[in-house]
Structure formats: structure tokens, C-alpha cells
């Protein structure tokens, strides 16, 4: 007969293995939107660049820094006008923002795993956008960043909030 401690250890090991299969490592990948989240996950739309596409980037270490390698489909979007959607991460205080990040997962969800740089887009808009916990769609010129000093992979410039 197994001791209660060994049964608990086996149960904890099985639970941690199950969790490891469903959630990525924090700060890597497109993030994980847990089904327990009070926020609906982003819907795939044909008129919006997919996070599945943007997250196909790989990274490698070169000379003490991480360098992204983008697939051809992502590189083809560089300097093109696109729509992206995500959850706002304000970079400054205030109800309205002109410089913020969009995340593939809600940043206020305690059940969700944050994304790495492939799950974030830096956004600069012409007109201020009201902060919201709901998903935001922005249209603007996408820059695919090969050597950003902040480690970002994507930036939308000259953007506008759209539906």
C-alpha cells in the first residue's frame, strides 16, 4: 500500500504534467487564453492579421542578444497597411492612448499566460484611442522589427482604431 505522501506526490506530478501540456512558458509564444478567463478570446477574422501567423517567428541567440527570424509570410507584411487586434496595454497614464501595446491575450486575466514578444505589437496612432478592457482593432503600417532595442518584433505606425 502506498503512503498518503506518495499518492499526493504522484497526483501533483500528474497535475503539473497536464498543465505543462496546455500552457506555454511565461514570456514565450503567443500567450495562453485560459477558458476560465472572464474575457472572450480574440476571434479569427479574415480582414485582420492573425496572431497565429505573427507567432510563427523563431528566435536565436547571437552575440549576447536574441535575434528574431521571421517566415516569408510575415516578412511580406513589412511596411504594408494591415489590421491587427488585441488587448490594450497602456504605456502612459490616461483614459486615451496614442502609444500602447496590443497583446494577444488579456493582460488583466489572472488565469492567462502572458505572451512573449511574438504576442505583442507596439502601436502609435494618429488620434488617441480610449482605453478599454475589450479587444481593440487598429489599422496602420506594420513594421517587422529585426533589431528593436526593446526586444519587440512588431510595430504599427500611423494607426487608427477601427471596428
Spans of model-derived segments:
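Repetitive helical segments and hydrophobic/amphipathic motifs
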Residues: 11-12
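Bacterial N-terminal signal peptides that target proteins for export
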Residues: 1-8
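OB-fold and OB-like single-stranded nucleic-acid-recognition modules
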Residues: 20-163
Amino acid at each position: 500500500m502506498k503512503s498518503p505522501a506518495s499518492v499526493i506526490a504522484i497526483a501533483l506530478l500528474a497535475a503539473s504534467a497536464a498543465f505543462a501540456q496546455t500552457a506555454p512558458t511565461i514570456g514565450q509564444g503567443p500567450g495562453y487564453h485560459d477558458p476560465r478567463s472572464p474575457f472572450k478570446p480574440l476571434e479569427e477574422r479574415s480582414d485582420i492579421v492573425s496572431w497565429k501567423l505573427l507567432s510563427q517567428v523563431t528566435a536565436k541567440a547571437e552575440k549576447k542578444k536574441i535575434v528574431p527570424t521571421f517566415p516569408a509570410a510575415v516578412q511580406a507584411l513589412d511596411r504594408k497597411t494591415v489590421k491587427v487586434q488585441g488587448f490594450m496595454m497602456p504605456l502612459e497614464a490616461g483614459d486615451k492612448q496614442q502609444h500602447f501595446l496590443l497583446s494577444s491575450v488579456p493582460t488583466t486575466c489572472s488565469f492567462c499566460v502572458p505572451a512573449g514578444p511574438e504576442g505583442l505589437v507596439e502601436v502609435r496612432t494618429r488620434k488617441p484611442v480610449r482605453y478599454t478592457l475589450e479587444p481593440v482593432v487598429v489599422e496602420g503600417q506594420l513594421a517587422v522589427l529585426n533589431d528593436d532595442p526593446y526586444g519587440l518584433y512588431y510595430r504599427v505606425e500611423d494607426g487608427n482604431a477601427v471596428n
